[in-house]
Amino acid sequence: MRILGINAVFHDPAAALVVDGRVVAAAEEERFSRRKHGKRPVPFSAWEQPERAARWCLEQGGIDVTDLDAVGYSYDPSLVDHNAEGLDPAWEELRTTYASRAPYFLESALPGLDPDIVHFVRHHVAHAASTGLAAPFRDSAVMVADGRGENISYLAGEYRDGKLLECATQSLPHSLGLLYEDLTEHLGFARSSDEYKVMALASYGRPRFEPEFRELVRTTGDGGFRTDPVDWAAFAPRRTGGFGQEHADLAATVQKRLEDVLLELARWLREQTGQSRLTLAGGTALNCVANSRLHREGPFEEIWVQPASGDSGTALGAALHLAAEAGEPIEPMPGADLGRGWTDDELRGWLDRAGVRYERPDDVADTVADALADNRIVAWFQGRAEFGPRALGHRSLLAHPGHKANLERLNDVKGREQFRPVAPMVLAERAAEIFGGGPLPSPYMLFVHDVDPKWTDRIPAVTHVDGTARIQTVDAAEKPLLARMLRAFADRTGLPVVVNTSLNTAGRPMVDDPRDALECFGSSPVDLLAIGPFVVRRP
């Protein structure tokens, strides 16, 4: 079957194509529109469809829209209770009205599409399928926690032989994701966008409000939880300027309480299912600190997290769910590089049209290693783009990890807060000697690891204030060019580690196409652009 998956209702609109149980393509609309998160997460944007991402997915698969067997839409408007506690009836009615007309909006966006083949898939089921069906093992327990779907904020269950068996759900208004979003907004950041900044800030605080939050956020013993309304100003004033210690302490408290609740839920789920493996999705699964506590202290032997755990991943999950429901065997997700890519000839054409001076060295990996060893900042544009929020060696900014000032340099390039860390990529075969306390390999930057004390002074740019790092391990069999660059850098410096952060500037989505890469290179203090086999140097 040829199945297109669509996410469109809240934020991070995306499309994915699954053919005969195999993931062919997946992309977020923001990479095409250049609008961060694709659109605003408000009810009157629910009609907008990821039409450019969808058209590209079909093109990548060589499929005409009339050849599709089904379209999975990751939201079921029939399940929404407009009068549920905590929801605004007028806003919910508007959102569900738009969502219910999605087949016709898609027909307009993709001429030739039969609206009768569009199927509504529950939001949390789509999240669950994106991880439980895409994981490298067939059976697992599954946990999905986010802000909200139609009428719930959490689903727990298990996959057995490709079928989802639900064990527990949590109805609104109780929501771990919305709790974290509320905190994000109180701390002066953008909700449904900047929650990762709160996670970083938490490392600078201590959870001194924990007794109060144990009462406000608690499990119920049956696989659910309660989140009571929080008077945030009672703990720290709403941030409108600089940060105070109370802001960091509040972030640390909520982060700790989130982790504790997830651990309790995981232990309950293990007892219910007997599964030894856990798969995670939903926006909360992008909290790599919480994931790491689940790995260290939780009851599961192995944890796999969907790299696109946010709402964009529900496009993939909706398509996989329909494929599994049709009885098709599902192949594990081949990796996160599911987006657009260009041939060498196409890249040369872009460079020629841009009128920039470029060269084709014998080995771009060696050239980049030389530049990094000389403490240059490199923009790295290679292969197909990543699906999800993490830069995983396809659209990256790279730097030398041995110079602490590079953290500030990169944060300045990207317009980021200085308290935020940058991440290391490391050769998979060398990871265990440098990083501990987390799962290895760790190819998707979804866990934090402790930096061995012998290495903290050697790689200060990637060592966070709490002595951890969110690593990406690089396997030469899966990413030969990236591994070759890392080995060349290690030969020159003795460090099998390179700083890796996403290739973008402040407020912009990650670079996707060659035009984006050239624009980013030209508008930021980056020394070298490695684009396919070509190199562009700063004049």
Report residues per predicted region:
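Flexible beta->alpha loop and helix N-cap segments adjacent to enzyme active/binding sites
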Residues: 7-36, 41-45, 66, 84, ...
